[in-house]
Amino acid sequence: MLKHQIKITINAIKKIKKLLLKKKNFKLKLRIFITGGGCSGFQYGFELEKITKKNDISIIQSGIEIIIDPISIQYLLGGKIDYIENLEGSKFVISNPNAKRTCGCGLSFSI
C-alpha cells in the first residue's frame, strides 16, 4: 500500500485539515506534484483540488486525501510529508530519500 511508502506526519495532517476547514470544503484533496524549476532542477508543488484525475494515485489517511500523479509518485516513494512552523515561516516539507541533492532553501532538489 502506498500509504506505507509515503509517510504523512500528524503535523501535515493537522495543517491539511485546517486548510480544508478554512475553505469550508472537506471534499478537497491536496495534490502534491513535482515540476522542473528551482536551483537544483526540480521543485515540489502543492494545490487543493476538487477532482482526482484518471491516473492519480490517492492516499487517504486520517480523513484527508492526498493525490499524486503517476510521474511524481515515483520520485516521492519512501518519502515523508511534514508541515513545520519556525522563525523562517511555515511550510510543507518533503523528506525525499530519492533526492541526490537539495538546495539550501529546501524547496528544490535533483535526482
Swiss-Prot record:
Molecular function terms, GO-annotated: 2 iron, 2 sulfur cluster binding; 4 iron, 4 sulfur cluster binding; iron ion binding
Cofactor note: Binds 1 iron-sulfur cluster per subunit.
Residue positions binding iron-sulfur cluster: C39, C103, C105
Cofactor(s) demanded: iron-sulfur cluster
Keyword line: Iron, Iron-sulfur, Metal-binding
GO biological process: iron-sulfur cluster assembly
Function, as annotated: Required for insertion of 4Fe-4S clusters for at least IspG.
Subunit structure of this chain's protein: Homodimer.
Protein family according to the UniProt entry: Belongs to the HesB/IscA family.
Official protein name in the record: Iron-sulfur cluster insertion protein ErpA
Organism: Buchnera aphidicola subsp. Cinara cedri (strain Cc)
Taxonomic path: Bacteria, Pseudomonadati, Pseudomonadota, Gammaproteobacteria, Enterobacterales
